[in-house]
Regions:
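Short acidic, glycine/serine/threonine-rich loops at helix termini
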Residues: 14-19, 79-84, 127-131, 166-168, ...
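Short, catalytically relevant binding-site loops at active-site mouths
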Residues: 76, 122-125, 160-163
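Active-site rim loops that border cofactor/substrate pockets in soluble metabolic enzymes
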Residues: 114-118, 122-126, 200-205
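C-terminal non-catalytic interaction/assembly regions of soluble proteins
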Residues: 131-278
């Protein structure tokens, strides 16, 4: 009898090191369930990268770990690579796979925008509800960076699969009454108790519908370069950014860029009679 680990390897959302999200962290935090996660998270984030390796190696020395299956995903949330690793290879190969994952994960191909609108966040999308390596909204900017720089972020809803856990909503400035009505505190708060990132659970400004939420964010961007041509990006979630919506103010940035294909003529956002997009 023994343990075979199975996990995807990807950049972590709140620390950087040789082992980030993957098999080593799964042993340190995942297999330890709530207690394991809590015992690591309640120590300084500055040494998180060291703890993950320490805990992982200790578990391999004391538990019958037979090996692991590592998966890397591509930018379209599909499988890019599957690799079987012996316990020794978890130590030597996982850091190399992590480096590959940095190249294969999705990125919004812009440095910055005024407003980022995210239709839905959820634990099935990212541990933080939305992946900061895409959204640029890191739990601990002191230890991590990347993604797009948006002056304001709007989150419109949570996924059905997250069962009311709205962790990550606190990373936005504006949200909707719909999201807050669907948020279950008893599903959301235990995550914060475990990981200590209590600001992930904060409630942003609540607007009655999607239109008002987006309008508020657009009104409140003092750093915008051109207030008549605001730069806004709308994505369904951070895992699916192959097709995105951009405002006309961003058209000059994509017109001559071979990485973009313009799929439609400009159109108005399709708000329904209640001011919502869905």
């Amino acid at each position: 009898h023994g343990i075979i680990l199975y996990n995807r390897i990807k950049p972590h959302t709140s620390f950087r090191g040789p082992y980030e999200s993957g098999l080593m962290k799964m042993m340190a935090i995942g297999l330890g369930k709530q207690h394991g996660a809590e015992s690591i998270h309640h120590q300084s984030p500055a040494i998180m990268h060291e703890l993950v390796e320490e805990y992982g190696r200790t578990i391999m020395e004391n538990a019958p770990v037979l090996g692991g299956i590592a998966i890397i995903e591509n930018a379209y949330d599909d499988t890019y690579l599957i690799k079987g690793l012996s316990p020794e290879e978890i130590i030597t190969e996982e850091p190399k796979l992590k480096e590959i994952s940095y190249k294969t994960i999705a990125h919004l191909l812009f440095d910055k925008c005024d407003v980022l609108v995210v239709d839905k966040i959820g634990k099935n999308i990212s541990g933080d509800g939305m992946d900061p390596n895409v959204s640029g909204r890191f739990v601990q900017p002191k230890y991590c960076s990347g993604g797009i720089q948006a002056e304001k972020c709007v989150i419109l809803d949570i996924t059905d699969e997250t069962h009311g856990n709205a962790q990550g909503v606190g990373l936005a400035e504006v949200t909707t009454r719909r999201l807050v009505n669907r948020m279950k505190l008893e599903m959301t708060y235990p995550t914060g108790v475990t990981n200590t990132f209590l600001h992930l659970m904060k409630i942003p400004m609540i607007m009655d519908n999607d239109r008002e939420a987006i309008q508020l964010a657009l009104m409140c961007c003092p750093e915008a370069e051109d207030h008549d041509h605001m730069k806004m990006i709308r994505i369904p979630n951070t895992a699916h950014i192959g097709v995105i919506e951009i405002s006309e103010g961003m058209l000059p940035l994509v017109k001559n860029n071979p990485n973009f294909e313009i799929l439609t003529e400009p159109y108005d956002l399709p708000f329904d009679e209640n001011g919502n997009l869905f």
